[in-house]
Amino acid sequence: MKILVLNAGSSSLKFQLFDMEDESVMAKGIVERIGLDKPFLSYSKGTDKIKFDKEEPINHKDALQWVLNTLTSHEYGVITTLQEIGAVGHRVVHGGEEFTGSVLITEEVIEALERNKNLAPLHNPPNLTGIYATKAVLPEVPMVGVFDTAFHATMPERAYLYALPIELYEKYKVRRYGFHGTSHRYVAMEAARRLGKTLSELRIISAHLGNGASVCAIQGGKSIDTSMGFTPLEGLVMGTRSGDLDPAIPIWMMRELGMSFDEVDNLLNKKSGVFGLVRGRSFDMRDIEDWMAAGDEEAKKAMEVYCYRLKKYIGGYAAVMGGVDVLIFTAGVGENSPIVREMVCEGLEFLGIKLDKEKNNSRGDAIISAADSKVVVMSIKTNEELMIARDTYEIVRGLT
């Protein structure tokens, strides 16, 4: 069966087409500048990379049609007809409490997603737009929703409740949800597979470090805690997001600086994190590393704040699990930054975490802990799209 995986953003549509017989990627790419002038499609098939342009603005439905036309085209296609697509898997950021696992998308599911839109106003509306576009263009093809929050549905109350009036949770579902669940689930399963262990016997700490970043405690194969909360703003220091901070600071900014709700929201989500600490020069950790190596004190400070926050979370999660067996670094920074991994692990020998400096200098998939390290430290390339394809395949296969 061939599965098309879609991730719809506000002005983009990412896609991958999988052949589930061997889980190979047949083609992948992204349509960017949806709703704007001069949209373009970046398309990869094997080693071939092609870019297509349009002059006029397009919507998500047009973008999906463009992708499907390319996938079936004589010159660039990898399938002959659209009938070869057995199902479409959608990344949906927020499932709320209603969706604790991946589901077949029905009218009832769409209605529930519409109700939950306000839980993730930046992400869920475009995810829904992608679902509506698929319904219009591929009406006969089953769709599956895979939720970033679902893996964290196993968190106990003590981990997900905020110490706020309980009515806020009961009436409005204000609680910690967590995100990046599909990535944390994938790398945890991959770590267990590579170590020849069952997932249920391992205590795993997974650090997903991209522009957005979160860390997750996994025990008995289940997420028991994670750093992101009601929104993806809580937790670690990120590229442009503040992560944890005193909740009175936004109130102070509005009262003392006269900032509006939108201005505070924009500052915390788009102008903070390492970007804010280096005065808005860059949110790319590669720049921060280069500047730090050149003696830039602000970059050094930003790196220290970034790594210190993650180190605290690792210590905390080791405490709640009574130790740790595997520490995983994943996503852009986690997979490719030896200096971040080194600074985070430095001083954690008391937990049994010891890096091998030479192995740590590798990028991508590797065991990077020393031979005498009690904890296995791994760098694993995440693959959320494959996880979505697998879930979609399992659900749709059960329909026949």
Curated annotation (Swiss-Prot):
Cellular component terms per the entry's GO annotation: cytoplasm
Function of the molecule: Catalyzes the formation of acetyl phosphate from acetate and ATP. Can also catalyze the reverse reaction.
Protein name: Acetate kinase
Pathway connected to this protein: Metabolic intermediate biosynthesis; acetyl-CoA biosynthesis; acetyl-CoA from acetate: step 1/2
Keyword S-adenosyl-L-methionine part of the UniProt annotation: no
Residues involved in ATP binding: K14, H208, L209, G210, N211, G212, D284, M285, R286, G332, V333, G334, E335, N336
Predominant place of localization: cytoplasm
Transmembrane domains' residue ranges: none
Keywords: ATP-binding, Cytoplasm, Kinase, Magnesium, Metal-binding, Nucleotide-binding, Transferase
Binding site for substrate: R91
Signal peptide (from-to): none
Organism: Coprothermobacter proteolyticus (strain ATCC 35245 / DSM 5265 / OCM 4 / BT)
Catalytically driven reaction(s): acetate + ATP = acetyl phosphate + ADP
GO biological process: acetate metabolic process; acetyl-CoA biosynthetic process
Enzyme class, broadest EC rank: transferase
Active-site residues (renumbered): D148
EC numbers: 2.7.2.1
